[in-house]
Amino acid sequence: MINNRVVITGIGVVAPNALGAADFEVALKEGRSGIRFFETSQSLNFRCQIAGKPLITEDYKARFFDDYYQNKLDNNAIIYACLAGFEAWENAGLTHHQDQIDFDSGMIIGSGALGLDGSNHAVFSKILAGNNKRLGSRAIPESMSSGAAAYLNKILGLGNRILSNSSACITGTESVLLGYEHLKLGKAKRMLCGSTEGDGIFIWGAFDAMRILTSDSNEDPTNGSRPMCNSSVGFVPGSGSGAMVLETLESAKSRGAKIYAEILGADVNSGGLRDGGSMTAPNSNAVVHCMKNSLREAKVNSDEIDLISGHLTGTKGDATEIKNWKKALGGAQDKFPLINTPKSMIGHCIAGAGSIELVATLIQMEKSFVHGNYNIKEVNPDITAEIPLERIPMKTVHKEINTVIKANFGFGDLNCAIVLRKWKDG
């Protein structure tokens, strides 16, 4: 049976606090926030009037869209995915040709509420105004869940599997898992994997109605997202995209590619909406099962983990997540790995979260640092009852990071975990 080793050779990102991987590195180190106040949310009487949204400049967009005739796109989720995906492809040292198809390469770009983002511009507003005939040919492509992958592939011309997954907040990590499995089986040489999430009142309003967003920081946006903090009252919605080029080790070595990390193992599962699991809450037994299975496949012991990239949204679920990590990893309390999340800077980017956070993880591994968990005034005591305070860095720590486990958990009782090891020629 074919069992290829799989590595990551390219990264790209569009985040609320940075455009591109180089800028994202700086933002992570300095704790730069991309969370802002939105007057539209205030005018609609949203309880949460802040969000993390990428600031795409026309110059930044023009470098990509003017060359590839995508400048008329209205859907932000698609725009973010195209920018992040193309950056990752170039970062991997790969090229594309207008008149050729690359059957050795494929793509998995997941999305969440992509239709709610684009449909506002492309469909709803024109239909309600009686302008159905003016919808144009982009209405459906910009609204369909596979729109991001389709528009990006229009440029790259990849001929292997082209897939768009949608699994709530695990979408990004799951896209990488799916690409990893495809490459392990020898069905492709390269897979561009990632996810994207759009923004705007339709997406934000739906979460606001659930009363799971923060409502105490409309006048202080940058301090609104506070994962693991005792005073946190909900998460801040975010948007953006992360993308990575996954490649078989054989392919990467044959072309002398830079390798960021190797994927050692991964797992995805469901709690079945049983035993405490629901549409909005996880089944802790399933979460622990997922974490353990990813480590088992990776053949990694818990004491080898240097960093946990957690889900940690800034809700009451943070303490439960820490308990689950503790149960899955076992070991002495003082041996618990460092743990962080970039959500204090960018908010919870929903379907885009896993991929953006994986890019953040790869940057930290490459540059040997751990970014801080910013905005914490006092750590939730239910968390410090489980792990030592010093395992939760509040500012950037410069440290060699060799092995990381990254996990996300999503509505519908879904879980996904991935184990990565920094590449050191071997």
Question: What is the predicted role of each segment?
Answer:
Residues 8, 23, 29-166, 196-204, ...:
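Conserved beta-ketoacyl condensing-enzyme motif
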Residues 1-70, 250-262, 359-374, 416-426:
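ACP-dependent fatty acid/polyketide chain-elongation machinery
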Residues 127-136, 177, 181, 185, ...:
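Glycine-/small-residue-rich "gating" segment that lines the acyl/pantetheine channel
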Residues 5-9, 26, 32-37, 220-298, ...:
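Condensing-enzyme catalytic core mediating Claisen C-C bond formation in acyl metabolism
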Residues 88-103, 252-259, 290-307, 329-333:
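Phosphate/pyrophosphate-binding loops at sites that engage ATP/ADP/AMP, CoA/4′-phosphopantetheine
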Residues 81-94, 145-148, 153-156, 162-196, ...:
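Active-site-proximal alpha-helical scaffold in enzymes
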Residues 15-18, 65-86, 134-144, 162-177, ...:
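Active-site pocket-shaping loop/turn-to-helix segments
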Residues 187-233, 268-281, 310-319, 335-389:
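Acyl-CoA/ACP chain-elongation machinery
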